[in-house]
């Protein structure tokens, strides 16, 4: 279950943070998933026009057990901002939901938009693009990324709602 939060309230509470522990992603991402509000610890993938590592991630367990219960993770994908190929489609979106992921954020494109809207998963990306990726088996995971100029690290917490997305070095709610 997603805890109750509002990104505006989180920004109000952390507006004077100059340490870099609290960050705000720019408002360039569109909402494609069936879930509008989501949060969780971040897992990272870096790939360019090859979604092999995205597929491997969403086909793995997308949650962690905590004393408070099961917490879905958020996959953050650095697709280099490419608008030429889709890194996530209906099949992979369904796999992510089935495996317990809370959300997927892609600095790149998605496809199968109507299928993604029906999936119980938060999905943010730059745009839709019907072309699939090449399958070269390339990509890296579990590394610090710069997404639209903002640092995102494995283990950060990402909070997303209708107002935007914020990151924190640890869990806030």
Curated annotation (Swiss-Prot):
Family per record: Belongs to the class II aldolase/RraA-like family.
UniProt: substrate binding residues: 89-92, 111
Record note on cofactor: Divalent metal cation.
MF (Gene Ontology): 4-hydroxy-4-methyl-2-oxoglutarate aldolase activity; metal ion binding; oxaloacetate decarboxylase activity; ribonuclease inhibitor activity
EC number: 4.1.3.17, 4.1.1.112
Subunit field text: Homotrimer.
GO BP terms: regulation of RNA metabolic process
Cofactor: a divalent metal cation
Superkingdom: Bacteria
Protein name: Putative 4-hydroxy-4-methyl-2-oxoglutarate aldolase
Keywords: Lyase, Metal-binding
Species name: Albidiferax ferrireducens (strain ATCC BAA-621 / DSM 15236 / T118)
Function: Catalyzes the aldol cleavage of 4-hydroxy-4-methyl-2-oxoglutarate (HMG) into 2 molecules of pyruvate. Also contains a secondary oxaloacetate (OAA) decarboxylase activity due to the common pyruvate enolate transition state formed following C-C bond cleavage in the retro-aldol and decarboxylation reactions.
InterPro entries, A to Z: RraA, RraA/RraA-like, RraA/RraA-like_sf
Statement: the UniProt record of this protein carries the keyword Lyase: yes
Binding site for a divalent metal cation: 112
Catalytic activity: 4-hydroxy-4-methyl-2-oxoglutarate = 2 pyruvate; oxaloacetate + H(+) = pyruvate + CO2
């Amino acid at each position: 279950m997603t805890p109750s939060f509002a990104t505006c309230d989180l920004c109000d509470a952390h507006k004077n943070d100059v340490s870099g522990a609290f960050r705000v992603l720019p408002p360039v991402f569109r909402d494609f998933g069936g879930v509008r509000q989501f949060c969780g610890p971040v897992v990272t993938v870096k790939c360019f026009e090859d979604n092999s590592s995205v597929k491997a991630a969403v086909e793995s367990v997308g949650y962690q057990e905590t004393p408070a219960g099961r917490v879905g993770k958020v996959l953050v994908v650095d697709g280099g901002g490419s608008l030429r190929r889709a890194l996530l489609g209906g099949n992979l979106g369904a796999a992510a939901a089935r495996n317990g992921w809370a959300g997927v954020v892609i600095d790149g494109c998605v496809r199968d938009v109507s299928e993604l809207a029906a999936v119980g998963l938060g999905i943010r990306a730059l745009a839709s693009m019907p072309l699939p990726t090449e399958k070269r088996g390339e990509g890296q995971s579990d590394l610090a990324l710069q997404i639209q100029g903002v640092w995102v690290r494995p283990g950060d917490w990402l909070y997303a709602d209708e107002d935007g997305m914020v990151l924190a070095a640890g869990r806030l709610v």
